[in-house]
Amino acid sequence: MSMAALHEVVLDQVATPPALQSGGMVRLLTCGSVDDGKSTLIGRLLWDSAAVTEDQRDAILQASHSRAVNGEQIDFSLLLDGLQAEREQGITIDIAWRYFETPKRRFIIIDAPGHEQYTRNMATGASHADIAILLIDARHGVKRQTRRHAAICDLMGIKKVVLAVNKMDLIGWSEPAYRAIETEFARLAQGFGFTEITAIPVAALTGDNVARRSACMAWYDGPTLFDYLEAVEPRVEPADAPFRLPVQLVLRADGDFRGYAGTVASGTIRPGDRIVDARSGLGAVVRRIATMDGARAFATKGDAVALQLDTELDISRGAVLSEVSRRPINADVLEARLVWLAETPFDPELGYLLRTATDLTPVTSMSVQALVDFETLASTPAHACAVNDIADCRILLGRATSLDLFRDLPATGNFILVSAIDGATVAGGVITWAQSGAPAVGENVLVLDRALLARGLCADLGDSPADTAEFHRRAQEAAILLRSAGVPVLVEI
């Protein structure tokens, strides 16, 4: 196989993410700073696990020797770097998608770029992933881009992280250096929602602790990367997750057929179940679950279906059908954390639209409240954001839309923000708080302003950057507690 032919094979896996609907499939993201060895690590994993054809092996060997980028060693990154610009620069720019199977499991590997200027591509990949492999160069330790990528993984709801400390061969296989990096990352991860962090020392180029155990690191008694990936439990939706069907379109055919079509975002539905349109409150009983392959006895997350009901509901695209007892929130006031993806900074004077699963809602007002500081990972008060920033924002919508909080139901708790001028995506984020109706300041609304907080809860804080960040954190935590108790709150600090 020529390099041109290999290029075609890899490009086919770069441009568009494959269908991600498979019960036993793990969606795996590799991320980290530039030159930490992400593409080399995944290429090595594919190579050692016999996931590469003989033709591809021959092409990679020939290309590696002709380029001599690593002396006589194989350039495993060629298996992932499919774009011409990537091969010329030796970096990853776009997201590379690669299927990978072992006797025990199937994977979709998402190789994300490390350069800061391509962070938005990494965020796109993270939004599809179940597990993240976060690489760190053992020579350099945790860097700013490492923190940024960890924050984006947390933002996108990834719960399991593999900390792959790479290039251990270049520091003499030093256990103290590895332990120091492991400890530093564990400390910074305390501010995130990760439920499992597994640190593995590796050398991607030589294959140590990738698919085979390293004789050079006898002090390490944990799993190899390959062993971990075969054993890790994939993300599984709770069996009792509430039912959500964002309506994509209403189908009409054969005179009396009327089906509310969409992809089940959460939960399970069966004929005989009672459902409700969250926005209008109109309810009906599911009479039939229609698919391209005929009627189904039930439908669950990821299934594309058309529900036939015993009563016609006057709804359209953007509606969310749910179970009666656990409905989404109908909200026109949101608080969200987002990553800004556009080269053009946020401008409150420009028009934006909020796109949820199938709904598109005009934004009437949006303000930035805080930015994540990638040195300290604290939220610092701010009023502007630019490309690659992670911001906490308050968003007022022109009308209510049906949604959930991301922590409760990720499938219907995320969104993208698009430009009202050209439809380009400018940000992607998650909903942290929502309510119906913008509260007007008055006797029934508690206003948490700076003066009130400074008299009590924050009386011990000064004006230093650290104290300012803590002031903001306490204000937000107080607001969350009050809102959970049913008290309408405005935070004005």
Predicted regions: what is each one?
Residues S2-T40, T102-P103, A253-N444:
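C-terminal effector/interaction modules appended to NTPase cores
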Residues H7-Q117, A129:
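P-loop NTPase switch module centered on the Walker A-proximal segment
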Residues D36, W47-A51, H115-E116, R139-K143, ...:
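Conserved nucleotide-binding/hydrolysis micro-motifs of P-loop NTPases
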Residues S66-N70, D81-I93, L188-I197, E230-F243, ...:
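Active-site phosphate-binding and catalytic loops of NTP-dependent enzymes
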Residues R105-F107, A112-Y118, A126-R179, V489-I493:
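Conserved Switch II/interswitch segment of TRAFAC-class P-loop GTPases
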Residues I171-D240:
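Canonical P-loop GTPase G-domain recognition
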Residues L205, G222-A261, V276, G283:
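Accessory interdomain/linker segments of ATP-dependent helicases and helicase-like nucleic-acid enzymes
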Residues I431-I493:
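Glycine-rich phosphate-binding loop of ATP-dependent small-molecule kinases
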